[in-house]
Amino acid sequence: MRKPIFTGAGVAIITPFTENGVNYDKLGELIEFQIREGIDSIIICGTTGEASTMPDEEHKAVIKYTVEKVNKRVPVIAGTGSNDTIHAVELSKYAEEVGADAILSVTPYYNKTTQKGLYEHFKLIAESIKIPVVLYNVPGRTGLNIEPKTVKQLAEIENIVAIKECNINQVGEIISICPPDFTVYSGNDDMVVPLLALGGKGVISVMANIIPKKTHELVATFLDGNVEESRKIQLSLLNLIKALFIEVSPIPVKAAMNLMGMEVGKCRLPLTDMTEKNFEILKQTLKDYGLI
């Protein structure tokens, strides 16, 4: 019986940048903040971490630093996805080598593929390492959806243990046809409770960058049986979540963190600063929630 890598809230942590590269001192501070506030897992070098703008050397260095800084206090899941299967294998092997607890692998994007191609892509990655693999399905970004029947096939591979699912419409089918020890995590902060109600085990969250404790509570209250309290927390956070996705993520969450005094720097191009109008909406929302 495979155990979940984590249950609860994992943070899809941002990567703080300066003009010269990664701000490792700040990254260390953010990691300590997350662990202190009760986060259940740290997911590094994902979409929110802007891995797509990192050269391999930097990408690998961030994974290594995070693993060493966390030092087994919570599971570290390293984003190692690529639309080049061999490249994804290389990054995944490195993550395993430096001690990551699992890898997160997004579907190939731009060149896309067929469902058979998806199966072969993830199968080769999984066979190249021994640590657990979390599939990442985000069709709104990649233009490619892992169909439930393909997820079921992949879930039969021993170390493909979970999926971060952003297509909420197929969560029920995935959970109903996959093995009971296959874990489903929400990839949408506004749909955590619905996913948990269907049998999911947690969320890989953007909003946890600024409210890790509350994000943990959102999931923990549900899993502890207090569904009504979890529902109330989910609804209470909707306006904040809306503001955090008013522009392409992670633009707003980084802006929010800077407004909160965390000094995480800007996003890298092609991501740009928020429009003045949206920035003011975000700022007012943070004030409404008592975050600034």
Curated annotation (Swiss-Prot):
Transmembrane segments: none annotated. It comes from the Bacteria. It catalyses: L-aspartate 4-semialdehyde + pyruvate = (2S,4S)-4-hydroxy-2,3,4,5-tetrahydrodipicolinate + H2O + H(+). GO terms for biological process: diaminopimelate biosynthetic process; lysine biosynthetic process via diaminopimelate. GO terms for cellular component: cytosol. One of its GO terms (molecular function) is 4-hydroxy-tetrahydrodipicolinate synthase activity. The record marks 47, 110 as: Part of a proton relay during catalysis. Homotetramer; dimer of dimers. NCBIfam families: dapA. Catalyzes the condensation of (S)-aspartate-beta-semialdehyde [(S)-ASA] and pyruvate to 4-hydroxy-tetrahydrodipicolinate (HTPA). This is 4-hydroxy-tetrahydrodipicolinate synthase. It comes from Acetivibrio thermocellus (strain ATCC 27405 / DSM 1237 / JCM 9322 / NBRC 103400 / NCIMB 10682 / NRRL B-4536 / VPI 7372) (Clostridium thermocellum). The lineage of its organism: Bacteria, Bacillati, Bacillota, Clostridia, Eubacteriales.
